[in-house]
Amino acid sequence: MKAVILESYVMEEGDLDWSGVKALVPDITSYVRTDYADIAPRIGDAELVLINKCRIDETVLAQCPNLKWVGIIATGTDNIDLEACRRHGVAVANVPGYSTYSVAQMTFSLLLAICQCAQRYDRAVKDGYWQLGIPAEYGLLPQVELLGKTFGIYGYGSIGRQTARIAKAFGMEVLVCTRTVRPAYAADGVEFVDFDTLLARSDVLSLHCPATQATRGLMSREALAKMKPGAILLNTARGALVDEEAVADALESGKLAFYGADAFATEPLPPQSRLRGLPGAVLTPHIAWTTKEALQRLMDITTGNLRSFLAGKGENIVNP
């Protein structure tokens, strides 16, 4: 079989390499990055393709009649037309669970950056202002203790559940809004509520769901209006969940105290985004999944998915 890697940059950090994949499919062509217009020509007559964010849709599939398997080097499938792949007989495999701990960790990294103001005070010390008294430009910013605060979670998959464990370790009350409440969740010590209750009671609200037809624009202007005044909103899931203009308005009005985000509607975040100029926005460039350990799991599972497909089994297929 012939394979193509369209975004090799994803797995070429540190000690990571594609040797495991190349051992399975010696006839493989690799590209560092691929624009949409080049996707179909580069796949060509290959049966296998590995992607991260490249879009695979009807237009691409119609030009790649030999394609049999798409390996997503990620968990999310927003960029794949799964139904079109099914019609064309193309199996799509993703990598579930590889970044659970890393994304939950980033969620609290954002929250702690907000609550402790550590970066601002670090700068004050390094600039020598501690000896002089911290001046107004650094601000004696109020720090926030998490003990006893209410932490709301929308979406209770593996990442949401791990985030709940961390919140409870900080002594927070945890509320969860999720589509399905499973019997196994009974021992988690969280309270399951509807969306309006989640909005009204959460001091901190963290999003942990995929972007679907039902969840796109979840944090709309109307939803933000139902939140506690001065609440904190965190998004380490998908940018499409949030109306960023409405969030900017909420930050400017004080309705939201802070917005911590690692995912955005358009990435990289455009220069004209209002979020870039707001002190209440704490932003990172969609890196929650890129810890050394998570990337190694990503590579291992991706290689395993390919090995399974070649053996006729089809592991982690999302469009059976």
What label would you give each PLM region?
Residues 1-46, 175:
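N-terminal glycine-/charge-rich "phosphate-binding" loop or analogous flexible N-terminal tail
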Residues 297-298, 303-320:
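NAD(P)-dependent dehydrogenase/reductase Rossmann-like domain
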Residues 156-157:
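Glycine-rich Rossmann-fold phosphate-binding loop(s) that bind the pyrophosphate
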Residues 32, 73-74, 90-101, 178, ...:
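Short beta->alpha connector loops at strand-helix junctions that form conserved
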Residues 88, 96-150:
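Phosphate-binding beta-alpha-beta segment of Rossmann-like dinucleotide-binding domains, i.e.
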Residues 160-161:
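N-terminal Rossmann-fold NAD(P) dinucleotide-binding loop
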Residues 58-61, 179-274:
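Rossmann-like adenosine-cofactor binding region
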